[in-house]
Amino acid sequence: MGGAYLLRIEDTDRARSTPEAIDAIHDGLLWLGLHGDAQTTYQYARAAHHRDVAEAMIERGTAFRSYETSEELDLDRQRVADISERLRKVRNRLAHARPDEPVDLDVDLAGTNLDADFGDISFDQMVNRGVTLLLIERRLRELNPAFRSRYREGGPPPSPNAPFTVRLRAPDEGDIVNDDLIQGQVRIPARDIDDLVLLRADGNPTYMLSVVVDDHDMGVTHVIRGDDHLTNAARQIPIFHAMGWTPPKFAHVPLIHGEDGKKLSKRHGAQAVHEWRDMGYLPEAMNSYLMRLGWSPGHDDILSKEEAIPQFDLAQIGKAPARLDFKKLASVNAHFMALADDARVAALLVAEIEKSQSLDTAQRETLVRAAPLLKKRAKTLIELADQARFLLAKRPLQLDETAKSLMKDDFKQRLKRLHDHLAAEPVWEHAALASALKAFATQEGVGLGQIGPGLRAVLSGGAPAPDLGQALEMLGREEALARIADQV
């Protein structure tokens, strides 16, 4: 799409916009490699300008000072809550009704162009006569219109120093139209929009005002956000119009759902960016996986950020919510783990293990040597660390019960001969070591399967370990031979 990537911290909610919360945003974006093209804008720092815009709207007649008391506003909040509760009850009744069962809607449908008001009717009758939930909702809102301040026409304040808010003079007629680039055209009757508060009684701008002013001043052309903000577009468009500004294009992306099809929440696992990092995912894997949620570029390839940017098209984003698939995410992460630079993976591996134990220089060197071999077997950094822990075990290794059962006298004799055979190996590299093991098995007149389990137990103590040739190379000649000698 081109354009510039601007970072704005919307911190008008001062209670929630703590330094820790803001630092977490910066930290997460930096980890993902999302660096803004300009200096970060902090919304609250522009509050004085936002207040100036509110005053300009008053001068234009598109905003006004409102002196409603808290008691009056509480009554209106209760009215809105009552509407929501009635709608909830209607939805619940319709969801659980059998086709031939009478349904008491408890809603006055007078004036809806239907034949009559309805009391107890069956679900089939209701559908056949055109009664839908949308119609019921529309009727409830007709009976309970959006909030309109009694001061919108300029009534005098109740006292000379009465506190006031500044409100938008919401349009009364027509529809507010949002030609959404993903959801299609969304029309909301203007009468459903409240006289929104723009400045609170303490003089602080609200989010609704601040975001519109900042979008205009920053030259924002496209607002791409979650579809939980779809109704906010209908509230923000009139504010743009109130200042004579052209609204940006809106694109409301469906929210991500969990594997169970429900809206993503804490019960589905990690949510904050740092939690995904702590679970062992790479930033490039998160970028690639999240980019593809809901976006269908026409193929199933795993894309890097650099590959995806020129292909991205809002028209290819579906309206249905995408589901988070942890197995797919792990597969994508494994792909990027295998491609990652060896030195980087080694540093990440050392850092992951040092979360739970201290390492000396020799142990770090062992992990650095092992990382290129292990990285192709692990799906996350946590898996990588788990697979590497056998390398750090202190000698002599404490064998688990299964490993102990393999240490028969005849096997120990064979193990001694294997020790001498490997000690003579000139090249300590996994392919050469794998060949040496096969040659030894042939020399002993047995299959490799009669040597492998016991050798793996000797090298790891019974902990999971990779291919034997790789395990020997990772441990290094001295450590590997010493572990074998300990069990002879």
Language-model segment annotations:
Residues 9-11, 225:
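Short glycine-centered, acidic/aromatic-flanked micro-motifs in structured strand/loop junctions
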Residues 55, 213, 221, 234, ...:
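Short alpha-helical basic/polar micro-motif
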Residues 1-3:
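Histidine-anchored nucleotide/phosphate-binding helix
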Residues 23, 27, 234-238, 284, ...:
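Residues on a specific face of well-ordered alpha-helices
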Residues 231, 243-398, 404-405, 460-488:
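Catalytic adenosine-cofactor/nucleotide-binding cores of aminoacyl-tRNA synthetases and other
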Residues 6-8, 16-19, 23-26, 32-41, ...:
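Basic, alpha-helical terminal appendages of large translation-related enzymes
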Residues 65, 71-252, 257-264, 272, ...:
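Active-site cores that bind ATP or allylic diphosphates and position pyrophosphate for catalysis
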Residues 14-16, 50, 257-263:
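Flexible loop/turn segments at secondary-structure boundaries
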